[in-house]
Amino acid sequence: MAKKAARASKRSATAARSARPAARTTTPARKAPAARKATSVRKATAARKAAPVRRVTPARRTGSRASSSTAKAGKYVYGWGAGKADGNGSMKPLLGGKGANLAEMARIGLPVPPGFTISTEVCTYFYANKRTYPVELQAQMKSGIARIEKIMGHRFGDATSFPLLIAVRSGARDSMPGMMDTILNLGLNDQTVLALETATRNPRFAWDCYRRFIQMYGDVVLGVQKLPSEDHEPFESVIEQYKEEAHGDAHLDDTRLGADDLKAIIERFKSLVLERTGKAFPSDPWEQLQGAVGAVFGSWMNDRAIVYRRKYNIPAEWGTAVNVQGMVFGNTGEESGSGVAFTRDPATGEKVFYGEFLMNAQGEDVVAGVRPAKGGGLMGREQPKSP
């Protein structure tokens, strides 16, 4: 499929541009200390990075500290939101680059959707203890979700009003664009999607979120992926087959699909999951969250990530953090959208605003090349009423 290849190519190209420039969030008052610290960290790690990369797992390198299943109780979840944060920008070894920068942005008052970071120590423990977690983690995650609920005013798994939906993303110390996994719109099931539809009075939006969630979760967490005998990704094949049958055009733009189309595709997705896994798609939001966290930690040791770390001398024992964050939506209609932005041109370093966006889309659409993205300079023209 040309479209699928274009998406993958676009993701790689866009991800490479966005590898590092996006996370400069410290204030002018802190600039000098941050620079000194960054220099110190680079000097301290230069020798380690210069050495040949040893093919070891996190468990081997840190086994003496985390090999016991009765590890010492500690703090594993660091929250942020509403102008407060448990962490800060200097904590990248523990919180990963994304988590540390989100915490710093919250601390300086930027409008960051609330969330929490599960630290890299949990990743170390995960690999040292047969993919299990510290006993304290579940309670700390529940406290983190409760904090997001309080700030956003929605409840996780609520089937009576607007439900809290969350995004689960990786966050290594050094940026590894496109190498690990992301799940969006987590928390949807057959009941909460109806609540979302009623609360927003936007059926297409609600069912589009559910379709996206099943597709991402099925791929990343449940392993419903292309078999050696198949030419295309199975979920994409389902979508294109439906478009051909219902509309006579397998390459119809996704935004042209209505709520009834999306409902039909979702039923086919569920059948695909049952056929490939032998189990129904999980409906319990907490089960969904636990599966997503495990999948992100698992993606630290996938083939893509291993090859990338070898190329850029990133030690395996660093591990990745996991960021759990309240969803904001760019797919509610033509007055919403998603994009990426930089305070400098990522290709040249020139001090000019640079970005690209798509209307009526979620973030993965921009990096995957689902539709041609538009330059950031066009935002004012297309959305003149935006602040």
Stretches found by the model and what they are:
Residues 2-20, 24, 28, 40, ...:
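N-terminal beta-alpha lobe that positions the nucleotide/phosphoryl donor
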Residues 94-96, 338-339, 371-374:
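Short intrinsically disordered coil segments
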Residues 125, 131, 194, 341-342, ...:
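Residue-level signature of transmembrane alpha-helix interfaces in integral membrane proteins
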Residues 323, 334-370:
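Beta-strand scaffold of nucleotide-dependent catalytic cores
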Residues 326-327:
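Conserved helicase core region in the C-terminal RecA-like lobe
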Residues 361-387:
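Catalytic phosphate/nucleotide-handling subdomain of diverse soluble enzymes
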